[in-house]
Amino acid sequence: MTFNGWLQILIYIGILLLLVKPLGGYMTRVFTGERTLLSYVLGPLERGLYRIAGTDEREEQHWTTYSISMLLFSLAGFLMLYFLQRFQASLPYNPAGMTSIGPELSFNNAASFVTNTNWQNYGGESTMSYLVQMAGFTVQNFVSAATGIALAIALIRAFSRASGKAIGNFWVDLTRATLYVLLPACIVMTLVFVYLGVPQTLGPYVNATTLEGAQQTIAVGPVASQLAIKMLGTNGGGFFNANSAHPFENPDAISNLIQMLAIFAIGAALTNVFGRMVGNQRQGWAILAAMGTLFIAGVIVTYWAEAAGNPLVHALGVQGGNMEGKEVRFGITMSSLFAVITTAASCGAVNGMLGSFTAIGGMIPLINLQLGEVIVGGVGAGFYGILMFVIIAIFVSGLMVGRTPEYLGKKIEAKEVKMAMLAVLCLPAGMLIFTAISVVLPSAVASIGNPGPHGFSEILYAYSSAAANNGSAFAGLSANTTWYNITLGVVMLIGRFLVIVPALAIAGSLIAKKTVPASAGTFPTDGPLFVGLLVGTILIVGGLTFFPALALGPIVEHLSMIAGQAF
């Protein structure tokens, strides 16, 4: 660890914090229907879309109608993406002549991109046509991210409104998230990435002659436009198989910094949106402080582990940190920071190979996934995810003082706690049950690339990534098989929709309750005591569940490494 490394980390955190208030203020105006500078340009387009769709922007929906709208929209996107892949060979914009995709992989990819996971059991530049990349994956990158933002805003309304029955209009929230938040930012980012050297073309792959006289095919395509929403929407699926480690997706330190900021920008700003909409910005800062505490702890441990390196390599006389699987242009500091950011959010993009991290360095990204992607998390998804833990923390505090728990004047009762626990527990169920089956199923074990505890970690990481809708992987696992394509797809759907529906049910329940004025006995939720309680709840409820599994994987691998054994 070096002073320069810590300085880079502090600069990143400082810039991110500077973005929170202005972006949060802008998003608040967007979702409360106030005019913004972009309203003069995008307002007519927005109203035109409502007329075409037959949507009345003033008509709000009950939580069940909101949920059904979201589920039907997701189903339509799933089917469209599935059939685009199945008929890829017959469709235009396929200059490389890519063949159609099989049913199992098409199912996995459709589930992956609709759920904002972007798990990739394929190499983009060698498998997918331009049409599928643009009309399929990039479109889903936008709408899956917009769906997450819409759902977070709906849940915020449940706390911010004194009483009512409706939580908003899904179609309006989806449209505004896309038009006013994602699209403008992505246009600017795309232009910046093109300036930095990221390709953006519909032309065919380039054939080149190397210095040795051999022929080489250089994959290009509409990379920059997909890269922008891949990061801002915390999608993570790369145009290239190497993802953001590829020089065409991440040319230099500037592009790397922009991508890291984009991953956290909207998720962090949503805490400010929450504070503004409930009328007390300290509430939002308290939640961001809890997220930040866990994030900084993860960065410290990962950076320390990777900078310390591998003692087995040191024994050979090679000193220094662990550079295996890392790009020299980023080094240990930016690779470690990127790994924690991408797994703290539900992004999954990587600028280095996580499976090549040390056992402890790789365990932190795994823990981030298993906590349920609540450390900033995906756009929208991270915020409604951490609100589930907020409800549980408030319930625990109520038990300790012997009074009915309240949060922002809304009584937290049995229904809300049950729904929150359902949302929290469905993730470890999906992660652990399918991991247990896979380690005893011969066809699943055959896909492991490394023996011993690291092989177990590869499987555990795969299902943790799928359930958390992250998409990153310990790439030693050969997951493009029928078993993994189907089961990982199912786990992705569980991790997305068995969290969303309970969250919307909570929104519907809370919005119907009248706001109760704060009293002397009300537990303060905007100070350090609440931050500590929330962090403790996340670690105990979300973290201890996985300790036995972690003991079988990265912990025993680390102890074995110290004892002189590698896997």
Swiss-Prot record:
How is this protein situated with respect to the membrane?
Multi-pass membrane protein
For molecular function, the Gene Ontology terms on record are: P-type potassium transmembrane transporter activity; potassium ion binding
Q: Which organism is it from?
A: Rhizobium rhizogenes (strain K84 / ATCC BAA-868) (Agrobacterium radiobacter)
- Keywords assigned by UniProt, alphabetized: Cell inner membrane, Cell membrane, Ion transport, Membrane, Potassium, Potassium transport, Transmembrane, Transmembrane helix, Transport
Q: What is this protein called?
A: Potassium-transporting ATPase potassium-binding subunit
The UniProt entry, under InterPro entries, shows: KdpA
What's this chain's function? Part of the high-affinity ATP-driven potassium transport (or Kdp) system, which catalyzes the hydrolysis of ATP coupled with the electrogenic transport of potassium into the cytoplasm. This subunit binds the periplasmic potassium ions and delivers the ions to the membrane domain of KdpB through an intramembrane tunnel.
Intracellular or extracellular location(s): Cell inner membrane
Q: How the protein assembles, per its UniProt entry? A: The system is composed of three essential subunits: KdpA, KdpB and KdpC.
Its cellular-component GO annotations read: plasma membrane
Q: Which family does it belong to?
A: Belongs to the KdpA family.
Residue ranges annotated as transmembrane are 5-25, 64-84, 136-156, 179-199, 254-274, 285-305, 328-350, 375-395, 421-441, 459-481, 486-506, 529-549
